[in-house]
A protein has these predicted regions:
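Active-site phosphate/pyrophosphate- and oxyanion-stabilizing loops and adjacent acidic/basic residues
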Residues: 37, 68, 138
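Conserved strand-to-helix beginnings and helix N-cap segments that scaffold or border functional pockets
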Residues: 12-16, 93, 133-134
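Acyltransferase
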Residues: 128-144
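Pocket-forming structural segment of enzyme catalytic cores
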Residues: 20-22, 40-118, 123-131
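Flexible gly/pro-rich beta->alpha loop and the following alpha-helix that scaffold active-site loops
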Residues: 1-31, 37, 43
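Alpha-helical elements of Rossmann-like donor-binding domains used by nucleotide-donor carbohydrate transfer enzymes
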Residues: 17-18, 98, 135-139
Length: 144
């Protein structure tokens, strides 16, 4: 589990090196917020700063790829808590990462890797704002 944190992935100590090891060893991983951004960066995606930070902000997800095991068997609406000021740039998403949900503005809120046990969520499933957090974590654990 790659947890949330301040800043951007390249400023997060050995995070990017750790992701390299995770990928090489095919270790199942879930990136949350900063972890989501770091996983995307590790595969070549770029980040984009939002015009205003979203801290403690509820968002309704639109699931755009039903193949994401994290989001299966969760009844809509999926409301999630956001605490970030950066997002993955959708124009830079590599082919091996599949965006699976978006917010109202079209920002990527989750993705999974086409061939590896890698998932990322921009939001915080552990937040009291998120109505789908426990189910999402159970779904992830079932993939491990």
């Amino acid at each position: 589990l790659l947890s949330p944190g301040p800043g951007i992935p390249e400023e997060a100590g050995d995070l990017m090196a750790a992701i390299g090891q995770i990928v090489r060893q095919r270790i199942p991983v879930l990136g949350i917020c900063l972890g989501h951004q770091a996983l995307a960066r590790a595969f070549g995606a770029e980040l984009r700063q939002l015009s205003a930070p979203l801290h403690g902000h509820p968002t309704t997800l639109t699931v755009t790829d039903a193949g994401d095991l994290l989001l299966q068997k969760i009844a809509p609406p999926l409301i999630v808590g956001r605490y970030h000021s950066w997002v993955v740039d959708p124009d830079s998403m590599p082919e091996e990462l599949i965006a699976s949900s978006h917010d109202e503005a079209g920002h990527i809120m989750s993705f999974y890797h086409r061939n590896l046990p890698i998932h990322g969520v921009q939001f915080h499933p552990e937040s009291c704002i998120s109505n789908c957090g426990p189910a999402l974590i159970r779904n992830w654990l079932a993939t491990c």
